[in-house]
């Protein structure tokens, strides 16, 4: 386990041991392909190189980077190697000041221009504009600017779901959903070592690296990660995506730490999901995107995941009219059938019709005695300057 650091003087922090620092080095120096659209070449980057390049250029542009952190499942992987969550997300957090729109735009331009450094040799860079780079390599751009949240996200595209996500945070109200995804590892000491030390790291000679749990209690969160336990704080603050993450934990054999409180947690998450995604098409897009990003190489787990999600929605949704709830359940069922069809387990199910018993709603003129499940509605992904945060 990471050892408690006396210099951190807080329950939320801990010093990484050599095994964890060594694993962190592997994550930061692993080559990750960033796939270009069309005829654009694949960029081969490491997290170490992209962090050093972006941080240096931000400082040159007058935006001070207070620290850089590894976040999400990659941080969890560093702390506990075989934790059941894998290491799909490569999330980096840059702590910066974003007082106005100008800083948001400057951060975006710096990241896009930094990508020029990673183009293969022989590629002419003279006529490649930031707009062109955005269309070629950016999977997602998000900007949030409210009283309690000021941050932006730039996601570099990887067709296998290992997007490199660069998050620039001024302030953010909540940085985690569950204790097991609350870890952040501060990279500055290791980055300093890369810049100035000529000696290779060893068990007896390596920088002190601090890990922090946004959950507030590092040892408790670490225990939850080791033992696959689901716990959180202030569940009413969890946004709509928390329901999808919770179901993801369940399909990976995590279990609730407190079985008495879990039903309340499930009701909170279901309610928030339908608040954030009230339209059936929004729900479909969110679910399909989540499956693509989190189960790209786990086709056999998709069906189990959707069935768990369906059970939770069926048992814990209290904020919807009956027909709205059934419409969402039907959507999840159709996605599950589609997954089975793609695995050649059953015939294609894009025109399955689901029949309902209409008795409780027969007096409702808007109620139909059957619901025809149309094929999934096609939609084209666009890449505007900024996407709203969901």
Curated annotation (Swiss-Prot):
Gene Ontology terms: biological process: mRNA stabilization; negative regulation of cell differentiation
Top-level taxon of the source organism: Eukaryota
Enzyme class: transferase
Pfam families listed in its UniProt record: NTP_transf_7 (PF07984)
Known EC number: 2.7.7.19
Catalytic activity from the UniProt record: RNA(n) + ATP = RNA(n)-3'-adenine ribonucleotide + diphosphate
Alphabetized SMART domains for the sequence: DUF1693 (SM01153)
InterPro entries, per the entry: TET5
Recorded GO CC terms: centrosome; cytoplasm; nucleoplasm; nucleus
Cell compartments where the protein resides: Nucleus; Cytoplasm; Cytoplasm, Cytoskeleton, Microtubule organizing center, Centrosome
Molecular function via GO: poly(A) RNA polymerase activity; RNA binding
Keywords tagged on the record: Cytoplasm, Cytoskeleton, Nucleotidyltransferase, Nucleus, RNA-binding, Transferase
Main location as per UniProt: nucleus
Similarity field: Belongs to the TENT family.
General function of this protein: Catalyzes the transfer of one adenosine molecule from an ATP to an mRNA poly(A) tail bearing a 3'-OH terminal group and enhances mRNA stability and gene expression.
Protein name: Terminal nucleotidyltransferase 5C
